[in-house]
UniProtKB/Swiss-Prot annotation:
One GO BP: nucleoside transport
GO MF term list: nucleoside transmembrane transporter activity
Classification lineage: Eukaryota, Viridiplantae, Streptophyta, Embryophyta, Tracheophyta
TM annotation in the entry: 19-39, 56-76, 86-106, 112-132, 142-162, 186-206, 264-284, 291-311, 326-346, 353-373, 392-412
Keywords associated with the record: Cell membrane, Membrane, Transmembrane, Transmembrane helix, Transport
Family named by the database record: Belongs to the SLC29A/ENT transporter (TC 2.A.57) family.
Name recorded for this polypeptide: Equilibrative nucleotide transporter 6
Protein purpose: Nucleoside transporter that can mediate uptake of adenosine, uridine, guanosine or cytidine when expressed in a heterologous system (yeast).
Amino acid sequence: MADIYEHQVPEKLRGKYQAMIVYCILGFGSLISWNSMLTTADYYYKVFPDYHPSRVLTLVYQPFAFGAIVILAYHESKTSTRKRNLIGYILYTISTFLLIVLDLATKGRGGFGPYTGLCAVVAAFGLADATVQGGMFGDLSLMCPELVQSYMGGMAVAGALTSALRLITKAAFEKSNNGLRKGAMMFLAISTCIELLSVMLYAYVLPKLPIVMYYRRKAASQGSKTVSADLAAAGIQNQSDLSDDDSKNQRLSKKELLFQNIDHAVNLFLIYVCTLSIFPGFLYENTGQHGLGAWYALVLVAMYNCWDLVGRYTPLVKWLNIENRKLITIAVLSRYLLIPAFYFTAKYGDQGWMIMLVSVLGLTNGHLTVCIMTIAPKGYKGPEQNALGNLLVIFLLGGIFAGVALDWLWLIGKKNAF
């Protein structure tokens, strides 16, 4: 039955650009809340000066994200993608709104109690991240590379746009009373609205787009059970005729999929170990004082986010897209030369060199991530693609977790670090 979907090119292409826009917004929604917190870290450093906010909050976030994605990936074949993603986006919406409530309730004052509450909300962000990222990448692995790239591009847009808005709000509120707090609250209010929009788009718009229906019906014909609820939301109730041939629905186990893609998984892990060992903690606490003053860390974060966005779109240029697995591995390992480069630049270099290094870090992070996530699912059946997408997200979040932990090593030998 799967063969009937191979020749429906007109239907397959209908709604493609609308789907790309929707997936871009969903990618934006999957990171806007967390990026808003990272980008407004200067506010949290003012409120909680003794608690290393950018490092501690990231370290709180990651164990919950990593633990949740491991559990969800193990049960991915029995979990409704629709319920999973909706729960994730709703959790993002509630958690972001709670940050505003927490700040208003404490009147922007610091202390151990408010910081504990902040950490609890950040832990909820971690759970939402694992729920959404694994679910979305598993679902997108069923589809064409352009939709995967659009979602990942949206994730980078979240970083670039929040950085741009942070620079604008800092300039606008810098001389006003409680300017940092006003800017941070504005960010969180915007993030809450975007998360709510993401819930609406995923629930009511995405399931009815023809190209999305095409790929989900194709996955169902190959034995995927995770798409049933999404197809039902599109008005396709009876799936018995789409998966009636069990001989065609046999799939590789998770162990076999991981063995065949171990280089992709390890490369994703290494990409994010390198990136998160530098960004954002090192940029906020280890780059010293320069002519840009309080703007310096914000400019560095903005440059990283902007070039990460550029890097996620460069694979669209055919001769820049890396599909050779050995070349990807070489490129990933080469990024580790950036670590000593950052160390010596922070110690001896000026701000121009640091901005250049941050740009390279962002560009390579975005480019290599998209290359891996778009080529890995090729050649597999729907259920296998969904499982592989979840497995890759485990290694991606594992790399982030390890990178965040290693980021603390930059504090060794620093006066008054703890």
